[in-house]
């Protein structure tokens, strides 16, 4: 019964991809161990190569045992196993979010190396119920309350084939087949809000969880049938994103869309322009929407961005000064800087540093800069935007600002593209 439900789910989610290989994320818990055995049956049946991936966050002594166990199972199933390691650098602030992002970075980068297009994860029905309650508690908008069984990360499709299967069925499957799993001790800690919600739900009658699941399904249907198509149309019609890392929003076209769609567009733009991975707070977005509705010019800072209304357009560019991006050494052919720009050098260029323009640097080369094009595009906000662009240095000397075609000689050649690591459950931006 369980396998038939899983098989129906995964075939519907993958569709006619014609895959020859697939990857699966396994942690050692009952959810992912069940998924591993179910996916193994399905992969053999469909002649698909299955890669098993685990990530050690180096936070619990038990993780070594878990990884060894996953390795053993993978070997017994004749599947290739990859154990990746997340370096927390002894920085424990905002650790859950950083660990999640680091985990997905590691796994999807490996998928790209293996030429794998799809990664399976073990999110099950109980996880969806918990997420809905968490987001409801945080006053999330309707897009935030929705869930998805498919999303993209680093151009890899993440699929959750256990979405409608409760944890109890997965545990029952393992018990019946005498398969061992590990319990993560941190799941019992009251330190995390999710665990408190999980404990409360455990004490409730099953019909309560069923009602939450029903509300989740209704929300998802509304998003899929009405709001998601409107969101895609709104982005296509009202948004212009420039290679300099700023955007203009046409407020006349923007005004015709529902408030839920408007809020999500503002959120998307703030994530992309700021280079951050997390969403902006809903109350911050609501404040911006209120300012827009007043039909007056304004300037505000939200989520690491400057938002400026100029008549019927909204300009958004990165805020600079409070949190400056780290310098990066360009050793290889290309590097991502500020989570927003991809800089590529030619083979003749020696190792150099990618950083931001300081006031001293600006004063030294000011007379040599041609900012006319940027000035016209940005409605005379060129000076502020200039300081958000990547510059290239060798031995503390500015040798290039590729965006404005500034080079101190004819030898250097760099290509720069605006390529934020933007992740969305509703639209896929490469």
From Swiss-Prot:
Q: Where in the cell is it found?
A: Cytoplasm
Domains as described in the record: The N-terminal region contains the highly conserved SGGXDS motif, predicted to be a P-loop motif involved in ATP binding.
Q: Which InterPro entries match?
A: Rossmann-like_a/b/a_fold (IPR014729), TilS/TtcA_N (IPR011063), tRNA_Ile_lys_synt (IPR012094), tRNA_Ile_lys_synt_N (IPR012795)
* Single GO BP term: tRNA modification
Under which EC number(s) is this enzyme classified? 6.3.4.19
Which PANTHER family did the record assign? Answer: TRNA(ILE)-LYSIDINE SYNTHASE-RELATED
Keywords of the record: ATP-binding, Cytoplasm, Ligase, Nucleotide-binding, tRNA processing
Q: Which CDD domains does this UniProt record tie to the protein? A: TilS_N
Enzyme class label: ligase
Summarizing the function annotation, the protein's role is: Ligates lysine onto the cytidine present at position 34 of the AUA codon-specific tRNA(Ile) that contains the anticodon CAU, in an ATP-dependent manner. Cytidine is converted to lysidine, thus changing the amino acid specificity of the tRNA from methionine to isoleucine.
Query: Which source organism does the UniProt entry give?
Result: Rickettsia prowazekii (strain Madrid E)
Residue sites binding ATP per the record: 27-32
Q: Which GO terms describe its molecular function?
A: ATP binding; tRNA(Ile)-lysidine synthase activity
Highest taxon in the source lineage? Bacteria
Name of this protein: tRNA(Ile)-lysidine synthase
This protein's encoding gene: tilS
Record family assignment:
Belongs to the tRNA(Ile)-lysidine synthase family.
Under catalytic activity, the entry for this protein gives: cytidine(34) in tRNA(Ile2) + L-lysine + ATP = lysidine(34) in tRNA(Ile2) + AMP + diphosphate + H(+)
Record-level GO cellular component terms: cytoplasm
């Amino acid at each position: 019964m369980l396998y038939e439900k899983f098989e129906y789910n995964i075939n519907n989610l993958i569709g006619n991809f014609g895959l020859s290989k697939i990857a699966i994320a396994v942690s050692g818990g009952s959810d992912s161990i069940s998924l591993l055995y179910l996916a193994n049956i399905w992969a053999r049946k469909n002649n698909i190569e299955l890669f098993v991936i685990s990530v050690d966050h180096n936070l619990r002594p038990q993780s070594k045992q878990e990884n060894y166990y996953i390795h053993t199972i993978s070997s017994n199933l004749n599947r290739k196993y990859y154990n990746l390691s997340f370096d927390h650098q002894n920085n424990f602030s905002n650790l859950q979010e950083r660990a999640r992002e680091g985990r997905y970075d590691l796994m999807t980068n490996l998928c790209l190396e293996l030429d794998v297009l799809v990664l399976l994860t073990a999110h099950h029905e109980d996880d969806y119920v918990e997420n809905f309650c968490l987001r409801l508690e945080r006053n999330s908008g309707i897009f935030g309350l929705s869930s998805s069984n498919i999303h993209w990360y680093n151009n890899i499709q993440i699929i959750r084939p256990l979405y409608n299967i409760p944890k109890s069925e997965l545990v029952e499957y393992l018990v019946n087949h005498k398969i061992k799993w590990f319990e993560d001790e941190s799941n019992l800690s009251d330190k995390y809000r999710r665990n408190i919600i999980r404990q409360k739900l455990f004490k409730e009658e099953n019909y309560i969880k069923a009602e939450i699941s029903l509300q989740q399904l209704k929300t998802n249907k509304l998003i899929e049938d009405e709001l998601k198509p409107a969101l895609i149309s709104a982005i296509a019609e009202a948004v212009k994103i420039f290679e300099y890392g700023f955007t203009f929003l046409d407020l006349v076209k923007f005004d015709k869309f529902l408030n839920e769609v408007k809020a999500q567009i503002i959120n998307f733009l703030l994530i992309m322009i700021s280079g951050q991975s997390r969403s902006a707070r809903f109350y911050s977005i609501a404040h911006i929407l209120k300012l827009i509705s007043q039909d007056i010019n304004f300037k505000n800072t939200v989520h690491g961005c400057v938002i400026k209304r100029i008549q019927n357009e909204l300009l958004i560019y990165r805020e600079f000064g409070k949190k400056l991006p780290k310098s990066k050494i360009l050793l290889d052919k290309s590097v991502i800087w500020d989570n927003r720009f991809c800089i590529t050098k030619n083979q003749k260029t020696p190792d150099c540093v990618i950083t931001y323009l300081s006031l001293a640097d600006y004063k030294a080369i000011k007379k040599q800069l041609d900012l006319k094009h940027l000035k016209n595009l940005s409605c005379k906000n060129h000076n502020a935007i200039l300081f958000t662009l990547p510059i290239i240095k060798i031995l503390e000397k500015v040798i290039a600002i590729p965006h404005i075609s500034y080079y101190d000689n004819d030898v250097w050649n760099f290509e720069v593209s605006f390529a934020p690591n933007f992740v969305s459950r509703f639209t896929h931006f490469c």
